[in-house]
């Protein structure tokens, strides 16, 4: 049984091998037919189109090309006449004819026959024919070369135009992308409005600085609708915790935002003004990257000692009432602004003065005694040069805590060499007024001396007040207001 099983398995294996071999033969047999049926592979056509210039035959080089062809044809004809084969039997037959018959044939033949009879088989034609043909071929080759050179020049010009057009297209696309990126970064897409809030002080400072020193006064317009005032008031309240009250409210007045004359003092103190810029800052210049110009370094007088211990809410409400009236200049054409006030003293550290009387005198004056110090107002009243001189040389006399009558100027203060002046810095484009009346002499207010007895604590406070440094952190500012009673600010 075992032997028969082995034989059966062997036979099955042999059958499998035979079937596999037969299949291989069947597959190999039609292979030559398939090889013959394979199509011949063709070269793929190039998709790149070669742009070339035209061969312009209507040109001087084309004229010389045609001339060379004609000269070469003439040379070929001359060579054919010189090397034309001769036939001797025709010549022998013609010699038998009489002289009279030959004369009649010559007269009837004409000029062409005479020419062929004279120059046929001549040595001149054998020599001049190839020479003229060579001259014609030379002219043809030179003209053809010039034509192809002109075509190559045209192709180069075409390629250069293509390159320039692609470069210009890429450059315009990059400019559009940069404008879009700058618009997304700065928020100034085209002529859209710039919203004023507590965190946009740097952009307002840059825009107003450009407008004041470059003559862009007409590019600004004020929008004083009720809805926008309410919206900006809400935004100012939401961002009021970022800045101290005096600094946040005085920054609006420093930026030169002044209301229309029909507004009352309550509208001025609202602080909700919206400034719109049109085509001042381009897409490539970001207002956030402009440097902040340091206009003034001054120490602001603190309120009275009795008011130091008041709550922060009362201090904020009081500072908001004084925010828009902080920077004022007396009107030059009115007589009311030059009336001396008995309770107002100039900024002089050598003379002692009452803190409470200063605060009450600043609150006593109304808004009609002066005008906000803005680029447009200064330009209307005094001109561009005098407004710059006003902002630069008398920056020490500006008090952000006082009323309109506190802006006093003295000759010693104007000539002090240590104070910053714009005409000593990079204020190019403005000429200093010479041999003319100084407009700052109109702002002189007579000094009124008030005698009062002070305690030792008040004297120490006044002495320490004159030597305080400017603080640039809001937390220290608030703590110093509550503890020492000093208020510092920065622009």
Swiss-Prot record:
Region: Disordered, residue numbers: 16-41
GO CC annotations, alphabetized: membrane
InterPro entries: DUF2371_TMEM200
Main location: membrane
Keywords: Glycoprotein, Membrane, Phosphoprotein, Transmembrane, Transmembrane helix
Compositional bias per record (Polar residues), positions renumbered to this chain: 20-34
Stretches assigned to the Cytoplasmic side: 1-61, 148-491
Positions glycosylated per UniProt: 100
Compartment(s) where it occurs, according to its Swiss-Prot or TrEMBL record: Membrane
TM ranges: 62-82, 127-147
Membrane-side (Extracellular) residue stretches: 83-126
UniProt membrane topology term: Multi-pass membrane protein
Phosphoserine modifications at: 350
Tissues and organs where the protein is expressed, per its UniProt entry: Expressed in cerebellum.
Keyword Thylakoid part of the UniProt annotation: no
Entries under Pfam families matching the protein: DUF2371 (PF10177)
Family the UniProt entry places it in: Belongs to the TMEM200 family.
Record's protein name: Transmembrane protein 200A
Organism lineage: Eukaryota, Metazoa, Chordata, Craniata, Vertebrata
